[in-house]
Amino acid sequence: MLHPTEVEKFPPTLLYFGNEFPNDDVNELFRRLQQHSKDRRFRLLNAYLEESILVLQDEVAKLPHHIKSRVPYFDNIVTLSEHGYLRDLGLGAAMESAFLLILQLGLFIGNHEAVDRELNLPKNVTTVAGLSVGLFSAAAIALSASLAEVVRNGAECLRVSFRLGVYAGDFSSSLEAPQPEGMLASWAHVVTGMTEESVQSELTRVNEDLGNPETSKVFISAADKSSVSVSGPPSRIKAAFLQSSDLRYSKSLPLPVYDGLCHATHIYSQDDVNTVLEISESLIPATRPFQLSVISSRTGVPFTATTASDLLSEIATELVMGTIYLDNIIEGIVRHIGAFPGAQSCRIDSFRTSIIFKGILEAIATDHPDLTIEKNDLVDWVHQDFGTRRRNDPANSKLAIVGMACRMPGGANNVEEFWQLLEQGRDACTTVPPDRFDLETHYDPTGKTENAAQTPYGNFIDRPGYFDAAFFAMSPKEAEQTDPMQRLAIVTAYEAMEMAGLVIGRTQSTRRDRIGSYYGQASDDWRELNASQNIGTYAVPGGVRGFTVGRINYFFKLSGPCLCIDTACSSSMAAVHAACTALWAGDVDVALAGGVNIITDPDNYAGLGNAHFLSPTGQCKVWDKGADGYCRAEGIGSVVIKRLEDAEADNDNILAVVLSAATNHCADAISITHPHAGHQKDNCRRVLRKAGVSPMQVSYVEMHGTGTQAGDAIESESVLDVFAPLKPLRRPDQRLHLGAVKSNIGHGEAAAGISSLIKMLLMFQKNAIPPHIGIRTEMNPQLPKDLGRRNAGLVFETTPWLRPEGKKRISVVNSFGAHGGNTTLLLEDAPERHRQRISPESTDGRSVYAISVSAKSKKSLQGNLSSLLGYLEQHPDTDLADLSYTTCARRTHHNLRVATVVSSVSALQKFLRSAIDSNIATTVQSVPSNIPSVVFTFTGQGASDRGVRQELFDDFPAFRTQVLQLDQLVQRLGFPSVVPALRGSTDEEVLSPVVSQLSIVVLEIALSRFWRLLGIRPSAVIGHSLGEYAALEVAGVLSAADVLYLVGRRAQITEQRCTPYGHSMLSVLATPDEIDRVVRRVPETSNVEYEVSCQNTHEDTVLGGAKADIEAIRKVLETTSYKCVPLAIPFAYHTSQMDVVVDELEEIAKNIPFKAPSIPVLSTMLGTVVFDGKTINPTYLRRQTRGTVKFVAAVETARDLGLIDEKTVWVDLGPHPVCVGFIRKLSPESRIAASCRRNEENLSTITKSLVTLHLAGATPLWNEFFRPNEQVYRLLNLPKYSWNETNYWIPYLGTWALDKALLKYGITPVGAKAPATLPAAGLRTSTIHQTTLETIDSMTATLHVLSDMQAPEFRAAVYGHTMNNCGVATSSIWTDMALAVGEYLYRKLVPQAKEVHMNVCDLEVLHAQVISKVKGCSQPLALEAHLDLDMQYMSLKWYNTNAATGERAPEWFASAAVRFENPDAWTAEWNRTGHLVLGRIETLRRLAADGVANRISKRLAYTLFKNVVDYSDWYRGIDDVIMNDYEAVANVTLIPDRHGTWHTPPHWIDSVCHLAGLIMNGSDASNTQDFFYVTPGSDSFRLLKPLAPGAKYISYVRMFPLSAEAGNMYAGDVYILKDDVIVGVLCQIRFRRVPRLLMDRFFSPPTADNAGVHGTPGSQRSQAPPAATHAATKSPQKTLQVPSGHVPNKASIVDTNHVQASHPSAVPVRHDQSNGVSGVSDSDSSTSITSSNSTADTSTTPTESEDADSGLVGQCIKIISRETNLDMSELTPDATFAQLGVDSLMSLVLSEKFRNELGIDVKSSLFLECPTIGEVKEWIDQNC
């Protein structure tokens, strides 16, 4: 006992922690705590709140996915408290206790810090009391000797409390099905006016009367003198109060206890407490002694524990098993106060006043009336104002870079190729490619030409226009107008995320709302130059910089911040710094960061050159004496950054760790663009100080290093002075290595910083420093001379950079902006990881693994499969477990999927080879956009298996916990444990019917929860016999406790009342009618009695009855070849044997609460589907036990109701997949999955089923499957996604970037210069004038060229072939161009080829090219060709091009192909037919000699030609002709002059081939008076040897009418012979008959306006200029049919021999439009011939013969095709507008086009309301 003087100094003190919140606004209290925690005076409060949140985040992360995924993000207590208790997630008890602990201990700590008082509670005079959860707060204080210890102990007590709440809530949900969301039902009521004894007596009687099983009893949880609290499941409490008049009429109130039971000794045991304490992972030392005593709320005396672990155990035990006696608490407190007789006062700390606290005060005052009570309210301080806040230090977490991707110059299209470029010391510098801009016109080294570049050099990435638009849900038009920087930013962002294994939402740190993007961009070349040539719909979202990051966030659905940053040359590094800052500030948990730069605008070259930034001699010469400026470069880079602790928790591969970052500005520089050494040093020192790193620890600095005299000198000074000072000097082992990536790839400007960072990351990864190649002559003399003394310098060859043993490498990356900004990043090695393994033989103990590959397109899927196979071939030692983890858990899964289950790498390789060889990608069906329905099927007793193998139980703690929890319920209900049965015990008791049936139900309920953990949630349930009980639990009709009680009691009653094996059951493969027919016709069984117990399928019937009868039936059926299988069960359920069971079962069930199902129940008792809460009741269970199992009827009803379909996945949740076997028979196309299977490992079965679900579109939560052992797996760096790319590129045409400089002189440029006048690199002929794109890969080549028909040689060639006094291009011109391009590209790919033999195939020309008579105008054409060497095939398409804008038309006017073939095959073919051709020639000559055939002279021949075409002298190669009807032979002599640069001059080709045209337009067998004949093209043109100048040839042809065309079309083969040997053939040249009256219409010269502005002859006034695109080629747009009358069917080409008539690009018109299309008809058929030259203004109406899609609906679809640049074949009925890239902007464009062109008014929302093509077509058909 204390001395009286000590009592005066230290009066008795009580700290009381109740179980109620203060009456204040709790959210406001939390807000106040949060505000104060930001003040430096409340550091411990801040620490406690942060520690508490970390504990809760950690605990939430451990919850099952279906719960944690719905927990809103929280990063502080205010965020969490404002979301409430989350009762609908089953977290009410856990969250309520957490809030109370955080509030109480936060207020306690803050109360002390507010007055700067340390914790000083004398042990002898202080005691701590708590009520219920408040005991954990009391424990935290009792275990702490200081406030700092309260922080740690409080957080860990919070952990135990939260876990206890989760456990109690989870366990309680098994006692009674959860209430519907939003409804609260109390689990406790307080009763006043009755004694504890009378209440207990009444409860004992009521529990017995209601038949409440042990787990559902109503019991006393708390008591005092005036009240008693009773607890139990809400429905049981309600029933008890209704059953007992004493309770019903007592004064009672429900308590706010909504989340389960505590204080229940009959439910919980010490095992439950031990489970909570084991999984809580408390950090409080188990042996920590008490500081203060804690009074028990049950006994009123201090707990007897002596250590921390014992105290927490006793508190937890009291909470779950101990009854609260308030009187004992009060007596214990009064006893403590009275222990100090000399005391004049006592101090009591509490949180406001409650009823219980008032009782404590009254008791003290009564027993000690002379004692002064000093009340200290721990809440008051929080409302005080403490003046100006003193800010805490910001967070300094280390950050982890976990993913990267890039496109760099020099062909470095991924990070591996980038490293190869660096390691090999390659220089990526080149001249500006022609697809960027034309150097010949835009480069002037003298600087005299305004706006011209003064240097031709740069560093450029490959294929900047190539993009997978469909993957990113963009239409071709949107993709084309979108800046390539935007496109490649999102591509590299995806690739970096893929490398990082970042699956959005996989973990707490990867939630969508916690990911942001930060990119640097400093130019808008595409918007300012390329796209501005024809500003389209997507000019703003496709070109404005902010959309670069906006597009990333939008596509990935990230709602975190997105910032586009422009700090000139340091933009990307500033963006990385911004991302790091956001992570340090807690704004995001994951940051995508990077930079972009694509160069297309010569203006920036001019500007930088005029400012003397650029080197006139080439690459950046960093630290070279001749450094003369930087060399521009392109680059795209992305990285993924996370906090280090998150990356480690998420099992990420960490490339490097960011220690700190800083940015400042050279404010003291001599000019804004001049660097300043002092500020650079400041920035470097700042990052070192923030990280606590010595400069001597830094072993590498990646310099900004631009290769300028000033920049290199100043940066070298700043770097060396900071990191390699003269005092103290670096030790010999502390070499400082330096380097600069710009010496390899130039200055990427906005992408420079990210290029340097990725190089740095690669160095960490490769453990090497690549050589510096910047010094081309000698070291810059301005640099420090003492590098040796400083132990610093460059590396000139690849040098090992190894991680020191037990230490980390530290490096610095510098990036400076021309505007004066400096950004510095400090990095270190990733933490070392040590591989864990379950066993030496296996990573995770599993024998089979799921491997998944997916894509969004079939081409990409095939590519991804090939890439994976290639990876395995390069890495044969790949760990299959890691590969499975990577492809399943760490990949985003797309709609096209291939997956398999394998046990070895070799088996996987075999599967992949087979898939690739069979081209499986073409047959894979896309998974449905809507998740298919999933039905859980629960098998009955027939599937019982002795022991479910232990893999699931051992490997999945969540499954094990569920089984053990359910087993505890089983034992509490008085039944034996089922765990031995599940583990395969053969003990007699284990094999009893009670245990057998309970083990099945426990297994099935646990499996249902396990599947839910894996993300598979049922849409409906169906149970077979016993399995229906488990189905009812999953559907929420019955609680788990009630189900187990009913099943156990039913089994007990059956055992008691029925004779085992007196009856039996028999499964028969026959219908009931077949069985009855066989049984009744056999005398031995004609009178036996049996029942149909189960109708499983139409031909699978289970019979039941007396054992002897069933055995007799079996013998009869087997003799008639019916398959029979006796069921090994002791009782015959669903037969008369159950008659003695059902009455008692129904009585027991009457005391059970039944609820409406939360999901449909396919009732096998009723053969229907149950939705309501009335149908399933005690009577239902009675009938279910006795009646027939109507499995077939239940399934068929569900199908009729639309609940299931062919896409439904059926998951069997039993010991063996019996029920899904029935489903397979009822619906063979159904997908089925099993949970367990006899004679197969559980994990193998589960893995196969997961793959089945995955392929069906019910994507599992793969991460949960790997989660129990996640740390043993490694994320593999697999090949990146195989993109299905198309080139979307708008070339800059003309010289208007230069021309605008003339305006200030009053000179107005007249149009753009003709492409023909622009010299270009590469191929150049008389018809090919400028190369706009040339890409050469190993096996493919692409060439885009521009030509001008008005160029002299081209114009002359066209005018050599005039029709109707117009120069019309002959198809020989297109043939020559095809041959020229074909040989050019082929030799690029096969330079060693001696000869190139080409077959020009499938030439088709839709629109004749009529040359304008206006002098000085331009008529540009575009030709696009792509050669595939594997296919030996090249495709070609010709387009009209807008002379003003340079944009090509969206549709081609001509197309062809070139096949590269073996000429030996030609010779063999022609040798077989040569004698026949020579025979016909000889016959014609004889007929001419006999006067039967006509011999025609050269002059007469070309006079006949003039009926249609007038050839110039060049083309007149025919010397004479013999003609007989449609057959002719001609002697030909080619003129010697080539008249230009050609592959094969067109006038030579025409001379040897146009005999066919002479027959059709000059033969007396042809009606040339009314018609002329034009050719749509030919099938093939082959020449064995080049045509020779002046050489003599023979041409022979016979034309035949095509029967399908009814005389309107003729075709023939033109044979070309030299010296009576066939040397060439023009196969199947076709001619179509056209009424002569249409000659003027088709062949009128274009107007000056049309030719000079639109660049296409006769463009109609209503037609918009053609859209520029280099997207995938499209089929030509069909034109409006005109009434039948005079025009041949399908005519499209106008050329007496090789000339094509043109179609208009006008769309069909409505009756209310002024501009129409004139037409004529032919008696045979309708036609679509129109002319682009036609400007007729008469309206016509389309014919009624058009098919469904050529009316208004078809016109709408064509507009959609045209405006999106999508091929018509892509517009299938099921194609969604979202997939096609039709966004809100495109919707507006389409609705406007519909209105303007078709006269129909539709809202743009139509494409949202009708999301597919088919729905839009139907809507238009019905409403327009």
UniProtKB/Swiss-Prot annotation:
> Per the record, what is it used for?
Viridicatumtoxin and its derivative, viridicatumtoxin B, exhibit anti-methicillin-resistant Staphylococcus aureus (anti-MRSA) activity. Moreover, viridicatumtoxin and a C2 acetyl analog, spirohexaline, have been demonstrated to inhibit bacterial undecaprenyl diphosphate synthase, a potential new target for antibiotic development.
- Tell me which positions the record assigns to the signal sequence: none
Q: Sorted alphabetically, which keywords does the UniProt record give? A: Multifunctional enzyme, Phosphopantetheine, Phosphoprotein, Transferase
What protein name is recorded for this chain? Non-reducing polyketide synthase vrtA
Instruction: Please state the pathway this protein functions in, per its UniProt record.
Output: Secondary metabolite biosynthesis; terpenoid biosynthesis
Give positions of region: N-terminal acylcarrier protein transacylase domain (SAT). Answer: 5-400
Stretch list, region Disordered: 1649-1690, 1702-1750
Q: What is the lineage of its organism?
A: Eukaryota, Fungi, Dikarya, Ascomycota, Pezizomycotina
**Which intervals of the chain are annotated as region Product template (PT) domain?**
1325-1644
Q: What happens when the gene is disrupted?
A: Impairs the production of viridicatumtoxin.
- List the GO biological process terms: fatty acid biosynthetic process; terpenoid biosynthetic process; viridicatumtoxin biosynthetic process
Q: What does this protein do?
A: Non-reducing polyketide synthase; part of the gene cluster that mediates the biosynthesis of viridicatumtoxin, a tetracycline-like fungal meroterpenoid with a unique, fused spirobicyclic ring system. The first step of the pathway is the production of the malonamoyl-CoA starter unit for the polyketide synthase vrtA. The aldolase vrtJ may be involved in the synthesis of the malonamate substrate for malonamoyl-CoA synthetase vrtB.
Positions with biased composition (Low complexity): 1714-1743
Enzyme nomenclature, EC number? 2.3.1.-
The gene is vrtA
Q: Where is this region: N-terminal hotdog fold?
A: 1329-1467
Q: Where is this region: C-terminal hotdog fold?
A: 1492-1640
Record region (Malonyl-CoA:ACP transacylase (MAT) domain): 935-1259
Domain notes from UniProt:
Multidomain protein; including a starter unit:ACP transacylase (SAT) that selects the starter unit; a ketosynthase (KS) that catalyzes repeated decarboxylative condensation to elongate the polyketide backbone; a malonyl-CoA:ACP transacylase (MAT) that selects and transfers the extender unit malonyl-CoA; a product template (PT) domain that controls the immediate cyclization regioselectivity of the reactive polyketide backbone; and an acyl-carrier protein (ACP) that serves as the tether of the growing and completed polyketide via its phosphopantetheinyl arm.
PROSITE patterns cross-referenced by the UniProt entry: CARRIER, KS3_1, KS3_2, PKS_MFAS_DH
* Occurrences of domain Carrier (ranges): 1747-1824
Fetch the Gene3D superfamilies from UniProt: 3.30.70.3290, 3.40.47.10, ACP-like, Malonyl-Coenzyme A Acyl Carrier Protein, domain 2, Polyketide synthase dehydratase
Task: Indicate the residues that form the catalytic site.
Answer: 569 (for beta-ketoacyl synthase activity), 704 (for beta-ketoacyl synthase activity), 747 (for beta-ketoacyl synthase activity), 1361 (proton acceptor), 1550 (proton donor)
Give one GO term, molecular function aspect: 3-oxoacyl-[acyl-carrier-protein] synthase activity
InterPro entries from the entry? Ac_transferase_dom_sf, ACP-like_sf, Acyl_transferase_dom, Acyl_Trfase/lysoPLipase, Ketoacyl_synth_AS, Ketoacyl_synth_C, Ketoacyl_synth_N, PKS_Beta-ketoAc_synthase_dom
What's the source species for this entry? Answer: Penicillium aethiopicum
